[in-house]
Amino acid sequence: LDVAVDGPTVGIDMESPLDNIVGFERAPKTDAEKKAVEDAVAVLRAADKLFVVDPAANCKLGPVDLRSGALGLGNPDPAEPVGHADLDATFSFNCTNASAAKFIDVNLFGAFKGLRQIDSQIASAQGQFKRQLKRPAGAQASQPVRLSWGK
């Protein structure tokens, strides 16, 4: 998960094996798999529920770009090896004060049961940071995890 705070925008780039998102790494075959893909795409498109940007930045969700060759989404990376099915996503938030953002509450673990950990890099006016988020245990697993940076 790469986060860039740049001008009036908070941009989030995500790359994940499809298995983490829908439970398999290929094009859907059964009706149940097709439904799982539809549900996952709907959740990802509602990115302002998955990523709650620090209210101090006053952000609104902008464009969401989802790409996956196996799922027939967007324009997937032609350099991606055949048979390696992943999902690439770009989420843009338009903000009135993006530089005030010091955290994002990430709800990916609650939305996608296959995720165990998220490696993140943040680039902001406060500097560059690396963070690792791990799935909370037990009842906390559905709670958001705060990705914070800066002072």
Language model segments and positions:
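N-terminal soluble domains immediately following signal/targeting peptides that reside
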Residues: 1-151
